[in-house]
């Protein structure tokens, strides 16, 4: 508690830094994965290669990637951009599969019927495919949220500030309270963001509960 | 009028789904395509609104080849009812019905008003307007499907096994209601079913489709029942089934109609 009292300021600062890395990566992965997932569902032949490719991405160890991305893109190794790009790669690797599954889960009959009554492809994507994909997509997004919030901490090894900094610093200086604080707040952030996903999902899919209630 | 002119559709592997099919659906009439599954009847139906384009031959609506029309606009001008209504599960009843007027450019309040009127037309309570499809019975979903198809007052109605997913009693009442609606609306209806009794109940003209869309016989329900063109039609219609071979019996002065096995069906009015 003594450590906490003396370091509330830096704890808050690192929490904000943590969120500033995790949230953009999560949102970016969603923006990237949705069109890929939708295309994979429409072009059957593209589905397996696309999923295999993103599967390989996930197999790359994270630490080397934190070092490799700055070299390839010519950005600072300790920059936020580096962390966000690396986190986005892993988040996208998970999210593409979820998005492809989500679009496959849209009932064929709903898609057929939308086309039959005169939706254009573009209009159908926004009005039918995307809303009906939300439940499965959300399940994937929740995994992405939790894993990304956790993965942010790895960046502290190469000096990108986040709650992970409390692990490295606390470990080096032998302050157990600092390590514990980093751990607890990281888990809390994951839980809060996960809860926000659940609430957003409920608000966006009133029909799903109507079907359950019946 | 819808005209099929020597229409053929081949699958990617070259095998025909329908081969060299010609027939017409006269304006304001109900034509029922009836055949077993895989006969190509749904493929034929989908050629009308360009969900499927023929490999060769033409489909004409009022003498205009549909392939010259924009598919999206064509579909908005044609009512379409699918099995179990084909409702969008994430839209309420009133939203589902209002979709087509909205797509055709009606304002939101106008489309909504139109949708509520359509609920009356198909005999549904306006209280159902804000429910989701999953909260309706199968029969109610079908009625909403019909309401949606009629919402933009199209000339043509395509119905693909629309009553296939409801129980026989509800199906019979839906068939009855469709007949009543058609009496006042006079749409040009192309209806697909595998149920010959449904065809007999609804059709001005029945087209019996064998494999690959080959037309085994076309005629009025009475013609099909009394003069089946060949053994296939006779078998399909079931002219030898006990319930088709009716007899008259006398029950204490009342003339009773029975089937071939003697089960009573109704009484005879002269």
Regions found by a protein language model. Give the residues of each.
Chain B
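Hydrophobic anchor residue at the start of the ABC signature
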Residues: 146
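ABC ATPase NBD coupling module
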Residues: 65-79, 103, 108-109
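Conserved ABC ATPase signature
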Residues: 132-136, 140-142
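Catalytic Walker B motif of ABC-type/P-loop ATPase nucleotide-binding domains
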Residues: 157-161
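Short helical segment in ABC ATPase nucleotide-binding domains corresponding to the A-loop/adjacent helical element
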Residues: 94-102, 112, 116
């Amino acid at each position: 508690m003594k450590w906490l009292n003396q370091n509330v300021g830096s704890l808050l600062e690192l929490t904000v830094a943590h969120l500033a890395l995790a949230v953009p990566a999560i949102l970016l992965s969603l923006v990237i994965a949705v069109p890929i997932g939708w295309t994979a569902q429409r072009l059957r032949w593209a589905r397996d290669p696309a999923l295999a490719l993103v599967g390989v991405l996930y197999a790359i160890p994270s630490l080397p990637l934190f070092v490799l991305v700055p070299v390839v893109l010519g950005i600072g190794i300790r920059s936020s951009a580096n962390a966000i790009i690396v986190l986005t790669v892993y988040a996208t690797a998970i999210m593409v599969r979820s998005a492809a599954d989500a679009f496959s889960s849209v009932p064929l009959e709903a898609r057929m019927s939308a086309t039959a009554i005169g939706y254009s492809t573009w209009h159908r994507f926004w009005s039918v495919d995307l809303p009906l994909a939300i439940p499965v997509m959300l399940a994937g997004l929740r995994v992405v949220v939790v894993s990304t919030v956790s993965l942010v901490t790895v960046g502290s090894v190469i000096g990108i500030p986040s709650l992970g900094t409390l692990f490295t610093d606390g470990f080096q200086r032998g302050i157990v309270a600092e390590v514990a604080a980093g751990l607890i707040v990281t888990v809390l952030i994951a839980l809060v963001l996960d809860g926000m996903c659940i609430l957003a999902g409920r608000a966006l899919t009133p029909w799903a509960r109507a079907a359950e209630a019946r | 009028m819808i005209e099929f002119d020597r229409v053929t559709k081949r699958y990617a592997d070259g095998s025909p789904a329908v081969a060299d099919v010609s027939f017409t659906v006269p304006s304001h009439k109900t034509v029922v395509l009836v055949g077993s599954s895989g006969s190509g009847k749904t493929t034929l139906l989908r050629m009308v609104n360009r969900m499927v384009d023929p490999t060769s031959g033409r489909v004409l609506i009022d003498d205009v080849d549909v392939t010259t029309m924009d598919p999206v606009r064509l579909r908005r001008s044609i009512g379409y009812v699918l099995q179990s209504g084909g409702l969008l599960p994430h839209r309420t009843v009133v939203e589902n019905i209002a979709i087509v007027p909205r797509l055709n450019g009606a304002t939101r309040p106008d489309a909504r008003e139109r949708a509520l009127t359509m609920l009356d037309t198909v005999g549904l309570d306006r209280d159902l307007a804000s429910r989701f499809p999953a909260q309706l019975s199968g029969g109610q979903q079908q009625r909403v499907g019909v309401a949606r198809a009629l919402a933009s007052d199209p000339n043509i109605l395509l119905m693909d096994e629309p009553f296939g997913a409801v129980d026989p009693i509800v199906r019979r009442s839906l068939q009855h209601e469709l007949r009543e609606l058609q009496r006042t609306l006079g749409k040009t209806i192309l209806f697909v079913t595998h149920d010959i009794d449904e065809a007999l109940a609804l059709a001005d003209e029945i087209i019996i489709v064998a494999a690959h869309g080959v037309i085994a016989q076309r005629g009025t329900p009475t013609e099909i029942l009394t003069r089946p063109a060949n053994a296939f039609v006779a078998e399909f219609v079931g002219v030898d089934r006990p319930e088709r071979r009716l007899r008259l019996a006398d029950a204490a002065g009342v003339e009773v109609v029975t089937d071939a096995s003697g089960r009573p069906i109704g009484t005879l009015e002269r």
